[in-house]
Amino acid sequence: MDNSMMDSTLRRILFFSNEFPSDDLKDLFRRLDQHSKDRRFRLLSIFLEESTAILKDEVSKLPRPLKELVPPFNSVLSLVDVDFRQGPLGAAMESSMLTILELGLFIGHYESEDTEWDLVPGQSVLAGLSIGILAAAAVALSSSLADVAKTGAEAVRVSFRLGVYVADISTKLEAPQSDGTLSSWAHVVTEMTEASVQDELKQFNTGTHSPELTKVFVSAADKTSVSVSGPPSRIKAAFQHSPVLRYSKSLPLPVYDGLCHASHLYTRSDIDSIINSSESVILPDRSVRLALLSSQTGKPFVAKTASDLFLEIGTELLTGTIYLDNVTAGIVQHLQPQSKETSSCQIDSFRTSLVLRGIHSAVEAELSRDRQLTRRDLVSWISRDFGPRRPRSQASSKLAIVGMACRLPGGANDLDLFWKLLEEGRDTLTTVPPDRFDLNTHYDPTGKTENATQTPYGNFIDRPGFFDAGFFNMSPREAEQTDPMQRLALVTAYEALEMAGVVPGRTPSTHPSRIGTFYGQASDDWRELNASQNISTYAVPGGERSFGNGRINYFFKFSGPSFNLDTACSSGLAAVQAACSALWAGEVDTAIAGGLNVITDPDNYCGLGNAHFLSKTGQCKVWDKDADGYCRADGIGSVVIKRLEDAEADNDNILAVVLGASTNHSAEAISITHPHAGAQKANYRQVLNQAGVNPIDVSYIELHGTGTQAGDAVESESVSDIFAPVTPRRRPDQRLYLGAVKSNIGHGEAAAGIASLLKALLVYQKNLIPKHIGIKSEINPTIPKDLERRNVGLAMQNTPWPRPAGKKRLAVVNSFGAHGGNTTLLLEDAPERVKIQGTEDRITHSILLSAKSKTSLQANMESLLSYLDQHPETSLADLAYTTSSRRMHHNMRFGTLVSSISGLQKMLRSQLDNPNFASEIRPVPNEAPSVILAFTGQGAYYHGMGSELFAEFPYFRAQVQQLDRLAQRLGFPSVVPVIENRIEDAPSSPILTQLSVVILEIALARFWSLLGVSISAVIGHSLGEYAALAVAGVISAADAIYLVGRRAQLVEERCAQASHSMLSVRASEDAIQEMLAVELETASITYEVSCCNTNQDTVIGGPKGEINDIRRALEAKSIKCTILDVPYAFHTAQMNPILDDLETLAKAVPFKAPSIPVISPLLATVIYDVKSLDANYLRRATRETVDFAAAIEAAQDMGLVDSKTIWIDVGPHPICAGLVRSMIPSASAIPSCRRNEDSIATISKGLVTLYLAGLTPSWVEFFKPREREYSLLYLPKYRWNETDYWIPYIGTWTLDKAHLKHGTKPKTPFSGSMSRPSALRTSLVHQITAETVEATTATLHTISDMQHPDFLEAIHGHTMNKCGVATSSIWSDMAFTVGEYLYRRLVPNTKDVHMNLTDVEVLHAQVASKTKGSVQPLVLRAHLDLSTNSMSLAWFNADGETGECAAESFATATIRFEDPEAWRKDWARLAHLVRGRIEVLEQRATEGKASRLSKPLAYALFKNVVDYADRYRGMDSVVLDELEAMAEVTLVPERYGTWHTPPHWIDSVSHLAGLVMNGSDASNTRDYFFVTPGCDSFRLLKKLEPGARYRSYVRMSPLPEDPNMHSGDVYILQGEEIVGMVGMIRFRRVPRLLMDRFFSPPTTTSVAVPVPPLTGATMKCKDITQTAPALPTPAPPIVVSSPVVSSTMACNIPEPAPLLATSSKSSTPKESPIVTPAESERAEPVDNSMTSQCLRLMARETGLEVEALTADASFVQLGVDSLMSLVLSEKFRAELGVEIKSSLFLECPTIGEMTAWIEEYC
């Protein structure tokens, strides 16, 4: 902090110049921008944001020609690179940028010094020249630095407006030069007085008769110079006209944009238009706080408010003359002493200038000699190093890349191999491997073979099909169908996370909800080629791109965003950029990003070759003169990115830092695939501006470098122009190196960008730029010739790239997409990390390894051993930290505690050398064992217990200290000296002893919880029961301390010390009594049983002498006895004196129900509620026997304890642990502390034990106290247990499809349709075109011809407008026909099929064509699914010529197969109501209140809309009462064709509703007719019978939501029983004048035209090729149809599964069985053969071997997900007749549980 700023006697001038500092302006603005992103410069950031907003606002108001001169910008920094000088906005931009710079530097100076506002009125005065006065005005109006951020932005507004206005006026005086040459509007003349210059100008202006507006005038003057202003041509003429001026010393000033200080030109109205605009947000009444000197008078402006001040300034700038002498005089006057106390003066300025130096010299000359004048620079702060940036927001953060992984060509399956490949300069070019496709058939260099590739070359990864399916919980079947890109995305994501040390949830930034995935992918080879040969259950999740990311999120349980991006060749780096954007936006805290490409499809080779993308000669020849295209490549890469501050907080290794990332598009390119230098350069500038980086500082660029003539030329131009410009030139030590990884490994397309990034990251790690191998002959002549002069070029040899001391290297990575996208990343070195050295290391360290299979675990151990052999110097502490805290852990585990690397190596070798090692590996159980805390009594007390934990772990220390403070507040002594071992060895008092033990135990219990141990129950031994009750929440910790302390005090007060003693006897209570029977009979001794610890371990107590006698007696009988080191005999009569008082004290303590079960040694039971826990309990626990053995037995009996339960002994020494092991020999008992052992080592050993038992302790908490002392090691990656899941492309069908010549006209599907045999043929359903039947699903496609005689006659039975119109009864019959047919195909022995036709909707009326001999085809598609007992149907028009279906269906419906008894029951409840209404109608007809219509009259009324043929006229009579009616119906006896239910019968029993709407007096049938837009359901309890009599009833009513729509239910009765119902039939009112429009016959034989494929399901009738189901599409406008033809909306029903295989069946590679994670007992064959059948079926469907289905194998591990469980469930039912719901796989999660269920219930 500058001390002068705190001097209250200091007189200060702040001078705001009208000139920019002499520094590099771009660099100044970059630094301002970067500082503004630091939270230490909050106000600077606000000012820049406000200024940017104001400039945007002002630019938006400009006239269009001016507005177009300003490029879009997000910050003022973006405008620094734009040259406005030659345009009309030069003055505006220069003025506003100068204002921004000076005020930004001013604000930043104060924030950098972290000083208070110290500009005191009277002591501080402001001065400035020209535009500088506006910046000074912002300070003058401010009373704090925060004010400057607001007022400063308004000063920017005025500066901009002033510049625009002046330029506009000035161009009206003289137009700019047509060639863009800049001319000065002002000259300075020296060694002449103002008067003499004025005389010369007056003579010129008068003599040339100049107009007043264009005269030359004096704009500024001082003692030594005069500034002359005017139009440039007029100034030139004036100097030529006047000999005095011509020969004077003069020079032009850099004033190019117009006139200011011209009183003859501007008036008050001009000033008002700039200053007093209504858009200004300045508070007009804001007070002037500081004096601001006028540049004309040298005196302060008189204005008192903001509006007046800006008005005065505007007047001076436009009309006033600058007099520097007056300014100097004003400054001197302010700095002259006002009192004796004032002794120092200071001028603050922005660097210095000629003018400022003159002012400074003049001021020094005028000041008194006792005045000390200093000058302070307000710019110098900007170059200071303020240490690591503290981001002001997430958007200001730098990003850290912390992990990476790859699968790249040339065997580069890891980073080391990739680097070796680069370092050696290897080329991975090869020909296409046979497992991709056969070059013998698919390669034709001549290009004559259609669909063949013209190049045989590529770059391919090794073993693309190898995958550890079991690790990722996938079945072999699912793995095989899953795209290798998806699989390797999973693998590399895991490896990158492993390298980064990411354990989801370990830190806030790695919480699963804050992790997202971003991957680039540009092809679907596997889905389109390999997997499509045999489409299975997993076709969609295995092939659709979105599942690649989704699978990563699902496996790791990340719930952040998941994006799959396609930007062609830049997809990988664009995904990284999207990830960076998400991090900057705060959408995620950790991002996994990458690019994916695995080549299998020859079609893409052919397409790219035909488009001239690919080289026919081999590898990418980047920058070579013979570059002829790129060479394709596989590639998979993943990186893990965090914000830098998060990575540092997480103790991550940082590979490099991302400063900026951007993507734009080459919109101005000559073609969509041609690169554009301008767009690339704009993207570079965006990234550089975002980071505030000087492009000259970038020293390495990884080029996109495809090796094409256009691409190389354009990229070399853009890179050299921005990063190595002609001026300013790079210094000799600023060499810019270039590289292109495509010359090594080819163009990975979607993975190209990620490969480039991985190379750049390795360059940072290795400090070496690998040599470029792309130039095979000589450099491409299109590359700029002057690259060497610009100090830029390719690294042709392996070139060291050392990190400069104290600096960071900058690198750029480019990736461009063929579609025009450009993505650029800017990187810098990671911050230098100084590892904190610990004062002492831990004695032992936990080393952990895990895997999901035995094979992988053994391999991981081998890898670690190999690593240690190669790196014996490895830090054991770092290794423990890495393997424990920074690894995800799995169910196959190895753990050990070692004290040296050599000891670990020995341990690993001994394990691996054991031939039975693999077979001895056991997985940890799926369900972690329970953990019980056992709290010891005071017998384990010693000084220094837990001291290491107290010193090492802040949490434990805080717990002890908090509890200790509670004890002290209760009046008890501090126990901390005991814990720290700062107490003398003399025996401690009972109070200190017991409090120390209880406080230690409560703290230890909480510490175990911190370490991730979930407690199942507690048990306390004697004193330990108080700690147990506190931990269980029965009493508070404070109450436990209080009771223990007071009890100890009572013991001291009431009980004689050393009068009694306690004896531990190695015998049971009964045995002791038997052995002492003689002594007891003689009453020579007495004792009491204090503790029954085990069945053979008893503690007795009593008077000291008698206990000694007992000891001697028992020892004489060879019984082991030990006198306990306690001063009292607890749990004996000695405690009687304290019991009443103790109980009284305890009654004041609240007891609560335990939060976890309490195992009670007093009651020998498990306590779950508070009923048994009260003050009396504590009384009894003090006096009565501690029956520890019985308590444990009770816990076992109640199921709380089993053989797997883990016991943690909580206390100073593991006493309870020994007791537990005596009771349960197999029990695992862990000590917390142990006498004479480092307690950290004890805890470590316990954590390893817990880990191996199946718990996952919180290692992060264990290492947290000293995490900065540890480093994350780059250990060998996880060793996968891989199997090759590869579906080879068989045959030549990609070539064969080209043989279908475009000119060949296919036969229509109807050619001979009536003659071809069909399994299903009726009057309406004519031909099956496709059919597939599986276990639980069936799909059927049929074709019908409406012109077929039977169909046509059915249509003509229902005519409208003299046209035959298909009634919905036709669709009903077709639906029932297909429904019964398919249902019987799946369930062949069904007696009757009862169908409910629901959701009937028709979009278009089907009108019969009147063209003779025409074909009018219809297509019906149906898909039945037994799992839902439903069948979806959709009807489509088809083209009579081509057979192509319309894109959208004209009708849809759903059939539901239901239980008719349910209908019968429902209708039985309604029948009396319907019959009642019928009776009422009959009665009203008799009374003449309702109309009774005969058949002729009824159908005559119908003719208002529809004319029915005789067979349709089934209604004998009708009673009509407004909108309610009933009809007597007799069906005609003839069927007239082959039907399921004849349409004329359906119509007869149901069209009463149409009569009500179109024949009732309640309807306006003159102007309207009514049509039905569908119904909700149609069902018949039994089939309609020929000639049978029925009754129909309906009541229609308007819908409240739509008055033009009516609805009602049509009931069909036979006798008294309801036998059918049309539910919610709807009718819409339609104007009659639309009849012709909707019901006219088609004019051509083609009623549907081919349309482009839609999203989702589309198909041709002749071609059953299928895609994913379509989503419902928005409904088109309603189309009205006949009364019985529904018309509402169209929707695409979900398409059925594929009907036909489109290629030969793939040959599946032989699968090796997955190594199961357990060497467990196989599921034994059982007598019930159903079990083995089920197992075989599961194995077959999942692709596993039956042997893999072990009893403890979980379905999750086997990859049986919800989809597979549905498949299995249906297979069980269809093949084995076993009803197993899919939910059972959740209820029985393992094979063993499932087989047990089958045995029990099947």
From Swiss-Prot:
Pathway: Secondary metabolite biosynthesis
Enzyme class, first EC level, given as a word: transferase
Chain segments carrying region N-terminal acylcarrier protein transacylase domain (SAT): 27-261
Pfam families from the UniProt entry: Acyl_transf_1, CurL-like_PKS_C, ketoacyl-synt, Ketoacyl-synt_C, PP-binding, SAT
Region (Product template (PT) domain) location: 1322-1641
Known cofactor(s): pantetheine 4'-phosphate
Domain Carrier: 1725-1802
PROSITE patterns: CARRIER, KS3_1, KS3_2, PKS_MFAS_DH
Disulfide bridge positions per record: none
Alphabetical GO biological process terms: fatty acid biosynthetic process; secondary metabolite biosynthetic process
Single GO term (MF): 3-oxoacyl-[acyl-carrier-protein] synthase activity
InterPro entries: Ac_transferase_dom_sf (IPR001227), ACP-like_sf (IPR036736), Acyl_transferase_dom (IPR014043), Acyl_Trfase/lysoPLipase (IPR016035), Ketoacyl_synth_AS (IPR018201), Ketoacyl_synth_C (IPR014031), Ketoacyl_synth_N (IPR014030), PKS_Beta-ketoAc_synthase_dom (IPR020841)
Annotated ranges, domain Ketosynthase family 3 (KS3): 396-829
Residue span of region C-terminal hotdog fold: 1490-1636
Region of interest: N-terminal hotdog fold: 1326-1462
Region of interest: Disordered: 1699-1729
EC numbers, comma separated: 2.3.1.-
List of catalytic residues: 569, 704, 747, 1358, 1547
UniProt KW keywords: Acyltransferase, Multifunctional enzyme, Phosphopantetheine, Phosphoprotein, Transferase
Residue positions, PTM O-(pantetheine 4'-phosphoryl)serine: 1762
Name under which the protein is recorded: Non-reducing polyketide synthase nscA
Gene: nscA
